[in-house]
Amino acid sequence: PYLLLLFPSIEPLMSLILVGLGLASFTGNLIGGHVSDAIGYAKSMMLGAVLQTAAMLLILVFQPSKWLSVLFIIGWLMSAWFTGLQLNTGIAQVTENKSSFMLSINGSLIQLGGAFGASLAAVVINLSGIHSIVFVTLLTSLALILIQVVSMRKYP
């Protein structure tokens, strides 16, 4: 809905854009896994959060440009999935692969977080319009960076 509201002319291309978003999810997760193997899960999670924030800023700045908006949304989705594997990797490393229960709880909480985020998005969109969703996403990305900085200092 966000892209269609900004650029109604892209409606015939939405199925291709959605395929691109799906490929971005897969690619982001794949690249994130390789980066996590190279630099460690904590640093790669921070990198993913910084990339997410940068992509949101670029979406905000280049909002009037149709194709740059689509490109940066694809980049944002890649960076969002960049951290997909790192949470489970971190739990597995900390518990020395002994806690399938914690991995299961983590998966459930990720689903709960997605449901909470979708509900929050619905409230924000109803109160102030779909354009404001970019600001909410930017604020949550910044909050994620702050939480990770505090966590990295507390648990080096």
Feature-to-residue mapping (PLM):
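Residue-level signature of mid-helix packing/kink "hotspots" within the transmembrane helices
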Residues: G22-L30, G114-A115
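Helix-to-loop junctions at the C-terminal end of transmembrane segments
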Residues: G28-G40, I125-N126
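Multi-pass alpha-helical transporter architecture, strongest
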Residues: L138-P156
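Small-residue hotspots at the loop-to-helix junctions and early N-terminal turns
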Residues: E11-V19, S104
